[in-house]
């Protein structure tokens, strides 16, 4: 990546890594059994962050599956969109840290879609409530 966008991504990646270092410092203070080398290797924290984001993202399918089983039909509960946004946001930060344009593009577009769908759900519920008055 080059130009202003590349510089912005690099700056954001450095800030995310600084945050990971801070988290590592706090973890080694709170959990003294953790190795001190964790502070010098923020990429280990970021790998955990990446897996956490992937876990949040995967939960949306489990929630959708359980809701569909409960109702004996295919449904997408509102929690699906919240987990999509949570997991997508964490994975987007992880993609910025990795400076991976393909990953950033996919997660960025996904976040837009999840937020838009949540907007439609909220608007539909507000419309249904106001219609019932």
Segments and roles (model prediction):
Residues 1-133:
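Alpha-helical membrane-protein topology signature
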């Amino acid at each position: 990546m080059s130009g202003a966008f590349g510089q912005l991504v690099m700056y954001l990646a450095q800030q995310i890594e600084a945050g990971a270092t801070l988290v590592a410092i706090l973890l080694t203070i709170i959990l003294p059994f953790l190795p001190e080398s964790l502070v010098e290797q923020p990429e280990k924290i970021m790998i955990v962050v990446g897996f956490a984001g992937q876990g949040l993202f995967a939960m949306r399918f489990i929630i959708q599956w359980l809701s569909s089983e409960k109702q004996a039909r295919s449904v997408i509960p509102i929690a699906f969109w919240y987990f999509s946004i949570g997991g997508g946001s964490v994975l987007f930060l992880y993609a910025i840290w990795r400076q991976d344009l393909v990953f950033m593009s996919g997660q960025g577009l996904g976040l837009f879609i999840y937020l838009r769908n949540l907007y439609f759900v909220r608007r539909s519920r507000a419309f249904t409530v106001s219609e019932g008055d």
